[in-house]
């Protein structure tokens, strides 16, 4: 699985066991992701941050 890094022109191959790509937004600004990468389980959203997860190459 290939996931985008914070700057989407760069990507990385996820290590074994991390089979989701994610991007994290601050709830106060849902237009600019503050973090992207590989993850094993999609975190729950909170009052401050929102996560979007997906399982195809460079979907984040």
From Swiss-Prot:
Disulphide bridges, residue numbers: 3-21, 14-38, 42-53, 54-59
Record's GO cellular component terms: extracellular region; membrane; other organism cell membrane
Main location: secreted
Gene3D superfamilies: CD59 (2.10.60.10)
UniProt keyword Disulfide bond present: yes
Family annotation (PROSITE patterns): SNAKE_TOXIN
Keywords associated with the record: Cardiotoxin, Cytolysis, Disulfide bond, Membrane, Secreted, Target cell membrane, Target membrane, Toxin
A Pfam family the protein falls into: Toxin_cobra-type
Annotated GO biological process: killing of cells of another organism
Tissue specificity field: Expressed by the venom gland.
Entry's localization field: Secreted; Target cell membrane
GO MF, one example: toxin activity
Subunit composition and interactions: Monomer in solution; Homodimer and oligomer in the presence of negatively charged lipids forming a pore with a size ranging between 20 and 30 Angstroms.
Family in the record: Belongs to the three-finger toxin family. Short-chain subfamily. Type IA cytotoxin sub-subfamily.
Function: Shows cytolytic activity on many different cells by forming pore in lipid membranes. In vivo, increases heart rate or kills the animal by cardiac arrest. In addition, it binds to heparin with high affinity, interacts with Kv channel-interacting protein 1 (KCNIP1) in a calcium-independent manner, and binds to integrin alpha-V/beta-3 (ITGAV/ITGB3) with moderate affinity. Preferentially binds acidic phospholipids like phosphatidylserine, phosphatidic acid and phosphatidyl glycerol.
Name of the featured protein: Cytotoxin 2a
Species the sequence originates in: Naja naja (Indian cobra)
């Amino acid at each position: 699985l290939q996931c985008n890094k914070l700057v989407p022109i760069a990507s990385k191959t996820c290590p074994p066991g991390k089979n989701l790509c994610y991007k994290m937004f601050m709830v106060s600004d849902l237009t600019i992701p503050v973090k992207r990468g590989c993850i094993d389980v999609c975190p729950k959203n909170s009052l401050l941050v929102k996560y979007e997860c997906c399982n195809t190459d460079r979907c984040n």
